[in-house]
Amino acid sequence: MPNAMARREFLATSAATFLPFQEQPPFVDILDTHTHFYDPTRPQGVPWPGKQDSSLYRKVLPEDYKKIAKPLGVIGTIIIEASPWVEDNQWLLDLAKDDAFIPAIIGNLNPLDEKYPEHLRRFAKQAKFRGFRINDNNLKKALEDEKGVQNLQLLSDLGLRLEVNGGPPLLMTVDKTAQKFPKLKIMVNHAANMPNDGKEPQKLWVDGMKLASSHENVFCKISSLTGSARAGGFKGEYVPLDYCRAVLEVLWNSFGSKRLVVGSDWPVGEKGASLKNIFDLPRAFLETKSPEERVNVFSGNARRFYGV
């Protein structure tokens, strides 16, 4: 019969082994590819979020995020600029300049703006600038405009990245963009924001994912899954893997282990679930994958995409 100390060690080990998944410590470092930071108390205020959004309209800075993210295994984050004000790109670059936790930012520029080339070249000279995000409708307009196409080509020529946000139709736009600019790295934001009712995903979305992922220069974020679950009608406090499994299976079968990344969409993501719940979903899904595949999705692919 084991002595008392050995028995205590066995019980402690067993308890850790059989804890529910959400109580387990993180098993791999996370490079969060999607956070927003802003300060409504600035003299000029902010264009987003609006004052009517009481949960978001507050000062949100990196130190606030680090307090809750680091204990979950987050080692750094890519900031996504939500403000359309050109100078807010510089505000973020200044915020990130001396912070090793923030290896890169994705700005917000309009390729149909007359001063776009000037703005892009200016920001591209700064070490942490990696490109900009655009919504689906504006990208469509740019692709239909001669100057817009030239400006997107400039983005590619400078070795920068394009992130695209919107609903499932954005996947068709991404397909066209990837065909026209095969050297431009493109990131689908929030898995194309398909409302998830916990059943089989919409055919439009599934077909779009297959089309977009057929281009090696296109990556996709596992992000806003909890938000999509809420949009699809989920009412529980904790969004479980089973509710999102079908969506994750499509993403995995489309992009594989080398072109998926993880993003929290913090602080917006907290409207749908806790930061822990947000990261628990891909963690649980990837439990059956190899250690190399888990590292790829949680940090390695982001390092390759953003060059950090």
PLM segments and residue spans:
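Mid-to-C-terminal alpha-helical segments outside catalytic/metal-binding sites
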Residues: 2-33, 53, 58-76, 249-250, ...
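Mid-domain alpha/beta scaffold segments of enzyme catalytic cores
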Residues: 24-158, 164, 168, 242, ...
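Active-site metal-binding loops of divalent metal-dependent hydrolases
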Residues: 35, 82, 191, 265-266
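Short aromatic-enriched loop/helix-cap "lid" or pocket-rim segments at secondary-structure transitions
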Residues: 41-46, 118-119, 199-201, 232-234, ...
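Residue-level preference for long, well-ordered alpha-helices that form the structural scaffold
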Residues: 54-58, 88, 144, 201, ...
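Short, small-residue-enriched loops and turns at beta-alpha junctions
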Residues: 84-85, 112-114, 138-142, 194-197, ...
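Catalytic pocket-lining loop regions of alpha/beta-barrel enzymes
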Residues: 141-261
